Amino acid sequence: MVHDFDPFALRISGDFGIRWYGLSYMMGFICAYILITWLAKRQRAGLSVQMVGDFITYAAIGTLVGGRLGYVLFYGPDLFLKFKSEFPYWGVLAVNEGGMASHGGIIGIVIACLLYARKYSVNSLYLLDLVAVTGPIGVFFGRIANFINGELVGRPCDPTYPLAVKFPQDIVSWPGQEAAKLTELVPVVEKVGVGREQWLELVDKFRFDMAAREQLYATLNKVIESIQDGNTAAKEAIAPLLTPRYPSQLFAAFGEGLLIFMFLFFLWRKPRKPGFIAACFVLIYAVVRVVDEHFRMPDAHIGFQALGLTRGQWLSLAMFVVGLILMVVWTRAASLKIPGWQRGHSIKLNRK
């Protein structure tokens, strides 16, 4: 299939509107609120139902700030020094340039939990357990939004693969990586009102003429938006030119999202020591992310690193080591167990 999803759930004007990406975060926080409220009622482990709203606010801020700073630190440090005359002025705040990083979001949530625990005298490890079991739901919605946006695309796959997807967004990278293929877009750009001679002239000049370069990229984006708006002629014309790819975003939605959530939720049906669920999340997420990255293209400006691994895989390996340490420390601690959610277990904290 040729990807033709519009990133806007509701486009109000131009680039202003309600995006699926924003809705995915909202859905993640709403689901987290509902589930944490339910757990707080059953477990009675120090977080009252009345406190859940404030806690979710802390977690949301930690997720957003940590996710963005994580991307800038791990994948785009040049954004710290990038300033523009237009809003939002600073590259760090321009979330449309690179987006968010899940590893950074995890760090942000940890800091948010520690701050909340200190202010409201709640067990910090219990808070980490709560976000560990609910966080994957947000990851699920986020990865679905990644797919709708046509970002974080998968690696090339066999054209006969039944789930193969072709992303028109690939053509935006052609000027810098596969310029020779630009001339093949003649029948495509003609479907959006750009003539053959005009397009070939832009292709000839874009390397040294800034105006031609801007117009060329504007035409490429026009093609993508036209396909998203239902231009079947452009969609059919571009299909043979695109590389079939794994729907890695959907793989991640299932693996990093649903699979981890179901496992941790099932695991917490019985009493566990504070931090046990969080440590399990760190370990499992690291493993699943390493596997998922085998189907996902690395960031173009970073590429593959040592041993043929991606930046995300190396970060996940480091995360796995941290998870092992946390598991050993937290499970050996002489702490009270937190009740599980399954009926029949005591709502009081039990000593092991």
Curated annotation (Swiss-Prot):
Top enzyme class, one word, equals transferase
Q: What is this protein called?
A: Phosphatidylglycerol--prolipoprotein diacylglyceryl transferase
Q: Which family does it belong to?
A: Belongs to the Lgt family.
Q: What does this protein do?
A: Catalyzes the transfer of the diacylglyceryl group from phosphatidylglycerol to the sulfhydryl group of the N-terminal cysteine of a prolipoprotein, the first step in the formation of mature lipoproteins.
Q: Which cysteines are joined by disulfide bonds?
A: none
Q: Which GO terms describe its cellular component?
A: plasma membrane
What's the EC number here? Answer: 2.5.1.145
Q: What pathway does the annotation place this protein in?
A: Protein modification; lipoprotein biosynthesis (diacylglyceryl transfer)
| Its membrane topology | Multi-pass membrane protein
Could you tell me where this protein is found in the cell?
A: Cell inner membrane
Q: Does the keyword Cell division apply?
A: no
MF-aspect GO terms: phosphatidylglycerol-prolipoprotein diacylglyceryl transferase activity
TM helices/strands, residue ranges: 20-40, 55-75, 97-117, 122-142, 248-268, 275-295, 314-334
The answer to whether the entry has keyword Ligase is no
The Gene Ontology biological process annotation of the record reads: lipoprotein biosynthetic process
Q: Which InterPro entries match?
A: Lgt
Keyword tags: Cell inner membrane, Cell membrane, Membrane, Transferase, Transmembrane, Transmembrane helix
Which amino acids does the record list as binding a 1,2-diacyl-sn-glycero-3-phospho-(1'-sn-glycerol)?
R143
User: Which positions are tagged coiled coil?
Assistant: none
